[in-house]
């Protein structure tokens, strides 16, 4: 469905609820009889806000074929694509972005989107050889956040970083070899400026040539014996540090 018709499937009631916030996003819904009873209030919202969207009753085996969840919730929605052009993401002069370079794991990508949404970021960009934004695991891991903020996809990492810098947003690469650590960056006032965090692949982080595209490189201090932090945790720390700095009195 994703490749042939530029449509994708959203699993579960939370995803459907979030998708309904954008008029025209939901094209059709499939639901089992049991789920129709369990989520009757949500289906009432669907009927009132999008009365032209067809709702198909299906049995358990059909739902298992439609859903990629281990335990299907019994309701899936077919939706229109999410991604926007990078130029549209940058047009409003964003103050906080997450740039994910070559992030391949759909669960991590979805969780970064969720973290960005929670931190009040203005958008996310999936760069390079990144996971498909519409992968069901990406959508599910975001818990609806893919519908809450603009998300761009761009294969040209260098071009995307240059475009972000061109609109006055400072690009900070999150990497263990950073010149500053996160606390020093915040104390210096650096994070109060419009910022895009450049985050690397789960397995090998940011290659030197990609980190070199950023205005500066910032590390997250590790005080214990852990070798590193996973991508989503690092993203949450960086994004929330920027959100705190940007929302401080007088910022």
Per-segment meaning from a language model:
Residues 6, 100-104, 219-227:
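Short pre-catalytic strand/loop immediately N-terminal to key active-site residues, enriched for Gly-Thr
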């Amino acid at each position: 469905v994703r490749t042939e018709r530029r449509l994708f499937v959203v699993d579960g009631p939370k995803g459907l609820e979030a998708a309904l916030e954008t008029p025209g996003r939901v094209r059709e819904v499939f639901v089992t009889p049991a789920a129709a009873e369990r989520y009757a209030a949500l289906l009432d919202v669907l009927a009132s806000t999008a009365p032209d969207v067809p709702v198909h009753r299906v049995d358990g085996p059909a739902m298992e074929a439609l859903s990629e969840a281990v335990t299907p919730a019994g309701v899936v929605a077919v939706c229109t694509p999410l991604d926007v052009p990078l130029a549209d993401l940058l047009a409003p002069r964003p103050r906080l972005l997450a740039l994910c370079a070559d992030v391949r794991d759909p669960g991590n990508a979805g969780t970064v989107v969720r973290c960005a949404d929670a931190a009040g970021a203005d958008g996310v960009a999936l760069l390079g050889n990144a996971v498909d934004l519409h992968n069901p695991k990406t959508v599910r891991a975001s818990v609806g956040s893919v519908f809450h903020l603009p998300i761009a996809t761009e294969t040209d990492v260098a071009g995307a970083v240059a475009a972000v810098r061109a609109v006055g947003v400072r690009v900070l690469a999150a990497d263990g070899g950073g010149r500053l650590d996160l606390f020093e960056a915040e104390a210096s006032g650096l994070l109060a400026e419009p910022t895009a965090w450049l985050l690397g692949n789960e397995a090998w982080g940011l290659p030197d040539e990609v980190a070199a595209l950023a205005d500066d490189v910032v590390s997250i201090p590790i005080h214990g014996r852990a070798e590193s932090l996973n991508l989503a945790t690092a993203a949450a720390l960086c994004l929330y540090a920027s959100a705190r700095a940007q929302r401080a009195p007088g910022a």
